[in-house]
Amino acid sequence: MMKVIPLGERLLIKPIKEEKKTEGGIVLPDSAKEKPMKAEVVAVGKIEDEEKFDIKVGDKVIFSKYAGTEIKIDDEDYIIIDVNDILAKIEE
């Protein structure tokens, strides 16, 4: 895999794909699904205030719906996003 290192206060995240079926068993085409807003952090740039943004590789996050720049790496979808567009960290 090509290594992508985000510059500045940015993250490289991989969207977590949602279920492609409805509760009734109907399979939804990609065009009918909403853009995912959950992702796993793949790489972290240089964060100035690490106490304010405690985000590490492997964390799962919720991000603003239309934030970031979508890119493809080895046929996988990723987003480069500003750390300020991260709304929450998911703890399981």
Curated annotation (Swiss-Prot):
Q: What Gene Ontology cellular component terms go with this record?
A: cytoplasm
Presence of keyword Cytoplasm:
yes
Q: Which GO terms describe its molecular function?
A: ATP binding; metal ion binding; protein folding chaperone; protein-folding chaperone binding; unfolded protein binding
Q: Which Gene3D superfamilies match?
A: GroES chaperonin
Instruction: Check the record and name the HAMAP family matching this protein.
Output: CH10
Query: What species is this protein from?
Result: Thermotoga neapolitana
InterPro entries noted in UniProt: Chaperonin_GroES (IPR020818), Chaperonin_GroES_sf (IPR037124), Chaprnonin_Cpn10_CS (IPR018369), GroES-like_sf (IPR011032)
Q: Where found, per UniProt? A: Cytoplasm
* Record function comment: Together with the chaperonin GroEL, plays an essential role in assisting protein folding. The GroEL-GroES system forms a nano-cage that allows encapsulation of the non-native substrate proteins and provides a physical environment optimized to promote and accelerate protein folding. GroES binds to the apical surface of the GroEL ring, thereby capping the opening of the GroEL channel.
Q: Which Pfam families match?
A: Cpn10
GO biological process: one example: chaperone cofactor-dependent protein refolding
Record's keyword terms, sorted: Chaperone, Cytoplasm
Annotated protein name in UniProt: Co-chaperonin GroES
Similarity comment? Belongs to the GroES chaperonin family.
On the tree of life, the source organism's domain of life is Bacteria
Q: Does the keyword Transcription apply?
A: no
Per UniProt, subunit arrangement is: Heptamer of 7 subunits arranged in a ring. Interacts with the chaperonin GroEL.
